[in-house]
């Protein structure tokens, strides 16, 4: 379901634009309706009031909590059931953040990701994306939404941008706290600067080598990492938001000295931060995370070379909070490790 469908349904009952906006604000922000200025009886026409119970029931059915798995780090992994019975994952993050899904499945096929193993099943509508935020807000405060769950937002651009515009206005989330995460797609760099709400941009880089990136992200657009960084830098300068480059650390694959040199070459002097996240190990996949000590040494080396680097723990590591693990692990066939020449670890 798209947000515009909700508006059309309200208009069909005689709601004016001011009524639509107040109803949608109450829903998106999870505002109380008993007492105060938000009581529907005080501002809605009778026909709209009569239609509200059915509408609210349908909105509640857009995203229902099937299971919740708290993590020791303050995160919580949510398995969310959509109205048609399909499931996606959301992750409540420490410090008032939420990671939402934009597709059921994913077509990019990252070799280290569970979600991509089942392919793309369907798009998640803009109202379903917002419904994940509403579901989370009923449990805790949400001030930041990252579009970094199941799916590639660039492959569902209309719904994702509609949800971003809605959350950045009616949903009362600061524009810099809406983070569009992508593997990189020319359409993203064309579309994001045009919207009324311009989100922060996170770019899944993972390697500076075009050949290796093609192996790790086999169905991502064939854009050279240098071209990706150039386009992202233009967006960063236009919006005054630094680009968040995402780097999943895979032991023996993208954690060697050659990548250090590549990162310095691409990112030195750029308006950016490099987020290095040790791989959230999946039992069914043949990849491992480097030790925390090795990852920290890598981050320190990059700091010394002038790259703003943050080493992060993957949220929900103890509850398998990585993208698609809960939903996809029993559906996917066994994986085969790609043949990549190992590189020496940093001294």
UniProtKB/Swiss-Prot annotation:
Disulfide bonds listed in the record: 99-323
Enzyme Commission code: 2.1.1.-
Domain of life: Bacteria
PROSITE patterns per UniProt: RADICAL_SAM
Any one Gene Ontology BP term: rRNA base methylation
Main location: cytoplasm
UniProt GO molecular function: 4 iron, 4 sulfur cluster binding; metal ion binding; RNA methyltransferase activity
Family stated for the protein in its record: Belongs to the radical SAM superfamily. RlmN family.
Protein name, per record: Probable RNA methyltransferase Lcho_2507
């Amino acid at each position: 379901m798209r947000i515009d469908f909700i508006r059309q349904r309200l208009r069909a009952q005689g709601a004016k634009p001011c009524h639509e906006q107040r109803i949608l604000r109450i829903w998106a922000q999870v505002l109380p309706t008993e007492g105060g200025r938000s009581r529907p009886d005080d501002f809605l026409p009778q026909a709209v009031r009569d239609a509200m119970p059915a509408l609210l029931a349908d909105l509640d059915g857009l995203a229902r909590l099937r299971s919740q798995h708290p993590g020791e780090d303050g995160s919580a992994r949510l398995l969310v059931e959509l109205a048609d019975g399909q499931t996606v994952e959301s992750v409540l993050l420490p410090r008032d953040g939420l990671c939402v899904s934009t597709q059921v499945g994913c077509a990019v096929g990252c070799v280290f990701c569970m979600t991509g193993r089942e392919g793309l099943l369907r798009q998640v509508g803009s109202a379903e994306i917002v419904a994940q935020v509403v579901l989370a807000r009923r449990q805790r405060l949400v001030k930041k939404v990252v579009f970094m769950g199941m799916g590639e937002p660039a492959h569902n651009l209309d719904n994702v941008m509609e949800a971003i515009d809605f959350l950045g206005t009616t949903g009362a989330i600061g524009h810099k706290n809406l983070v569009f995460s992508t593997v990189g797609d020319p359409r993203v760099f064309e579309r994001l600067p045009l919207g009324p709400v311009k989100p922060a941009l996170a770019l899944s880089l993972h390697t500076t080598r075009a050949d290796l990136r093609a192996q790790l992200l086999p169905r991502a657009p064939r854009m050279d990492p240098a071209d990706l960084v150039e386009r992202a830098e233009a967006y960063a300068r236009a919006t005054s938001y630094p680009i968040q480059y995402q780097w999943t650390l895979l032991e023996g694959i993208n954690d060697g000295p050659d990548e250090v040199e590549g990162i310095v070459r691409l990112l030195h002097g750029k308006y950016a931060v490099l987020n290095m996240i040790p791989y959230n190990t999946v039992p069914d996949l043949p990849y491992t995370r480097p030790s925390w000590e090795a990852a920290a040494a890598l981050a320190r080396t990059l700091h010394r070379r002038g790259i703003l680097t943050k080493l992060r723990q993957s949220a929900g590591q103890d509850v398998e909070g990585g993208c698609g693990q809960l939903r996809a692990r029993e559906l996917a066939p066994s994986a085969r490790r790609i043949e990549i020449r190992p590189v020496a670890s940093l001294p």
